[in-house]
């Protein structure tokens, strides 16, 4: 059984007398350990699709099975628990709390899980070590570079041992050098830790890090192809 399996998903909004179909019959299966990039122009449905996959929203109709759980049949009140166990999120804006240290930011999801303090600190340090930032554990976000802040956000996505990481435009606020640093980290998490990575991006060079590329247009999946990742070799060269 696929880790993620959507069948004929629709998301329909009523705007006055107009019916807007943000998703129009999308079926996708993603296996454990895949690295998938999702691309499409603004309004293509890719963000709506990500919100449903991330248990942040539910489809109007269709079925979504997440690691054996029928998300579409699960009460919204219970989806937060499913989301916290199964999914880690990384966003373009980092979403770090400014007045707390890198370590405390990484600990945050475990507070919601009622993890004991000593265990929280240990797991948060392990996550920071995994992203190469253990030596920056006591630094505030404004004492870190953009790339380092995003690595803290990635560490935060790891601490609950979720099998899936959803990354929504994770390099959107980063220069080329920092983008390569972050994308190399995603590649390592995928290859060495077996994390399933689902990446939304509008940048073709960033999408080349993935082993599979899905494209959306007008609420529909228009292509779904395997690819050989070329990573940093596909990134534009910075001017000297």
Q: Which role fits each region the language model picked out?
A:
Residues 220-240:
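Conserved beta-strand-loop-alpha-helix hinge in the C-terminal portion
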């Amino acid at each position: 059984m696929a880790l993620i399996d959507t069948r004929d998903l629709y998301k329909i909004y009523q705007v006055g007398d107009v019916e807007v179909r943000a998703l129009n019959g999308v079926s996708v299966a993603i296996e454990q350990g895949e690295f998938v990039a999702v691309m499409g122009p603004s309004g293509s449905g890719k963000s709506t699709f990500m919100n449903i996959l991330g248990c942040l929203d539910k489809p109007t109709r269709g079925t979504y099975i997440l690691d054996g759980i029928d998300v579409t049949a699960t009460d919204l009140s219970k989806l937060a628990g499913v989301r916290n166990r199964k999914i880690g999120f990384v966003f373009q804006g980092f979403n770090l709390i400014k007045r707390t240290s890198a370590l405390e930011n990484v600990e945050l999801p475990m507070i919601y899980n009622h993890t004991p303090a000593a265990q929280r600190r240990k797991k948060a340090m392990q996550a920071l070590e995994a992203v190469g930032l253990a030596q920056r554990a006591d630094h505030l976000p404004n004492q870190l570079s953009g790339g380092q802040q995003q690595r803290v956000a990635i560490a935060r996505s790891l601490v609950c041992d979720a099998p899936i990481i959803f990354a929504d435009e994770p390099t959107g606020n980063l220069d080329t050098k920092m983008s390569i640093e972050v994308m190399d980290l995603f590649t390592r998490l995928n290859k060495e830790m077996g994390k399933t990575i689902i990446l939304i991006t509008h940048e073709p060079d960033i999408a080349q890090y993935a082993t599979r590329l899905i494209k959306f247009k007008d609420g529909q999946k228009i292509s779904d192809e395997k690819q050989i990742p070329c990573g940093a070799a596909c990134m534009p060269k910075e001017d000297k």
